[in-house]
Amino acid sequence: MHKPRLKFWDIWNMSFGFLGIQFGFALQGSTMSRIFETLGAEKDNIPLLWIAAPLAGLIVQPIIGYLSDNTWHKSLGRRRPFFLLGAILSSIALLLMPYSSAVWMAAGLLLVLDASINISMEPFRALVADKLPDSQRSYGFVIQTLIIGIGTWVASNLPKFMNNVLNISNEAAPGVVPESVRVAFIVGAVVFIGSILVTIFTTKEYSPEQMQKFEDGDEPEKDQGMIKTILGTYALMPKIMKKLGIVQFFSWFAFFAMWTLANPALTSHIYNAPKPQIEEFAQLDSEGELQYDADRVILFQDDQARLEYSEQDKSYNEASDDVGSKMGIYGLSSMAFALLLTFYTSRFAINRKLVHMGSLILGGAGFLLMYFIPGEPEMLYVCFVLIGFAWGSILSMPYAMLSSSVASSKMGLMMGVFNMFIVIPQIIAALGGVVFLQKLIGEESIHAMTVAGVFLLFAAFSNLLITDRKAIKYDPA
């Protein structure tokens, strides 16, 4: 028995929750390093502060995958209970994040936010495989990418929109997150839970009995318990997953470098507007600690120092708004890429491997170009358009290739285990990998973007390892 083909709006509605998920990820990706810098973090320490995000994924993803494979709620079904739980927790974390008063607080909330986003996200990947026949899976993952692109662009532009259009200030006292960023996070929280509710109320799931019929009546494997099942899946990983894992490793190392270091790298190299160090302008005691007045306001050396700090901080915040806005372009170009693939894959067969390889090469070129355009911020549009092609492919092609090679009954667990190849490179990068490689090239943080470009090229050519014909090609007929 085969699953029926779904109409466009059915696939759109079941993927719509990804809009909120991407609002969370995009606000995190475009503003967290800015928040860390605002709270006093050193540039070289920023990747380490991000380690909470991949650690949460490493632990949460396979557990949620297993639980969602083995859950059935009479009203919410198999995957939707996790959509709702993750949305509630993520929205709370988004509301609290911009009100952090210390680096440790922001890092802790980042852990909560990323773990909560993963609770919602992993079942969404599995839902595509649950609901769609193999001939529509690339189509389904591409529509998810289309929605992700919309979310990335809108969310990345929110702080700049709040300042330029709504006249909400992007300036604040030292150590305080600007009001424009705070309001952007509040909007993100509302969109997150709202879009998830759209999917919950418009999408029905197949029952376990129906899923068994779609598996040609095969008896489901006996459940051996969560820990044993997860460890067994790691041990008996399909070859296609291992090969795709190499591609994913290089891809996600590159994007982690972008999320953590693009803001300090580009504000310094392209805009010549680095974050000013408050210690250079404030009064310090004999031990080098900041001095405060009775209201806990930092004391400056004199009025001239206060003015210079304010001007430099204003330039930094304006540059950060612009970097975040231009980063959103990669969401738009990934959306355009997804739209093109949506129409094409609904009618014609594609070679997934070659599509993914070509997209990653373009993304690598986008990162490498950044080094050669100091003082030319408009050229960042070109860079992020190219990066968006890679991002659009990363969010769809590997999952489409994998889902064609594993059973639907284990799809949630497989997707969770597969994401090990997403979080491990990020952990390595956070523990000093990206900063170490950057400093092999030079001290300037822009070299982190060069590292990202080289790693995307490694990812592109790693696709040559993939030989599974079922994973590489599919026909919409």
Label the predicted regions.
Residues 43-44, 134-144, 320, 406-418:
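Loop-to-transmembrane helix entry/capping segments in MFS-fold secondary transporters
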Residues 83-101, 361-375:
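C-terminal ends and interior cores of transmembrane alpha-helices
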Residues 93-97, 101-120, 378-393:
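Hydrophobic core of transmembrane alpha-helices in multi-pass small-molecule transporters
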Residues 2-54, 243, 247, 251-275:
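Helix-loop boundary and gating motifs at the non-cytosolic
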Residues 119-132, 393-407:
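Intracellular juxtamembrane helix-capping segments at the cytosolic ends
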Residues 1-9, 101-108, 117-120, 124, ...:
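Intracellular loop-helix junctions on the cytosolic face of multi-pass helical membrane proteins
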Residues 353-396:
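C-terminal transmembrane helical hairpin of 12-TM major facilitator-type secondary transporters
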Residues 61-76, 337-351, 437:
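Helix-to-loop junctions at the C-terminal end of transmembrane segments
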